[in-house]
Amino acid sequence: LDRRRQRQMCIRDRYNSMPFHAVSWHKSMERFGLNISPEEAYQYEGMRGVETIKLLAKRQWNKELTDEEAANMYEEKSNEFRKCPKAEKMDGVEELMRKIKTDGLKIVVVTGSGQRSLLEKLESEFNGLIHHELIISSFDVKHGKPNPEPYLCGLKKAGVMPWEAIVVENAPLGVRAGVAANVFTVAVNTGPLPQKMLADEGANLIFESMPSFRDSWNLLSENWKNR
């Protein structure tokens, strides 16, 4: 390992928006006759929306939806989400990102979202921390999480190898994707799911909240530099 090379941090969660997404999934899919409770929605966090819908349709209707059919249904979910209040930044995430930036790491955002308004907001609200050329969205990949493609794409954009990166995830499917990409994966449990679900997907480290990870960053960073 050339320790002079630029290293990379892939971060998934920046806003505390999942409670709104969960309710939006429930309300919108109910109109089509698909059942997904707000609690269940957390299990699919990080997956591309159209893939979530196709999976639900296959399980509940035994029907293979086309990409166009799923995209039309996802638009209903997006419209429902737009009615929700503005999501605040995840507690502790901006301070964490500033520490990461100070340590000289590239920050790559990997999101399953395809909402252009969110992608534009990321760069403006995290000024100097997030850059559009280092955002991986649903537009950049054919296969979303739990497939490793989003993180492999992030590695390629940053120009680093898997052992030169850390994935920060808060969803089981995202953890699975990070592990499958052979990247050291930190799970931060920001939702209601039991920590065992994150552990079962192979997370290398698990923190109970974003502030606890932020407060532990200096120690983790020092250990990582000395690998």
Question: Where would I find each of the regions flagged by the language model?
Answer:
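Conserved SAM-binding loop
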Residues: R14, K89, I107, V167-V168, ...
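Asp-based, Mg2+/Mn2+-dependent phosphohydrolase catalytic module
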Residues: E68, E94, R98, G114-R227
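Conserved phosphoryl-transfer catalytic core
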Residues: A22-Q43
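Short, acidic loop-to-helix structural element flanking the phosphoryl-transfer center
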Residues: R82-V109
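A metal-dependent, Asp-based hydrolase signature
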Residues: G46-F81, D91, K99
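Conserved phosphate-coupling serine/threonine residues in phosphotransfer and NTP-handling enzymes
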Residues: D13, T111-S113
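Anion (oxyanion) recognition and catalysis
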Residues: E30, K101, V179
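Single conserved hydrophobic/aromatic residue that forms the stacking wall/gate
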Residues: L1-R7, I11
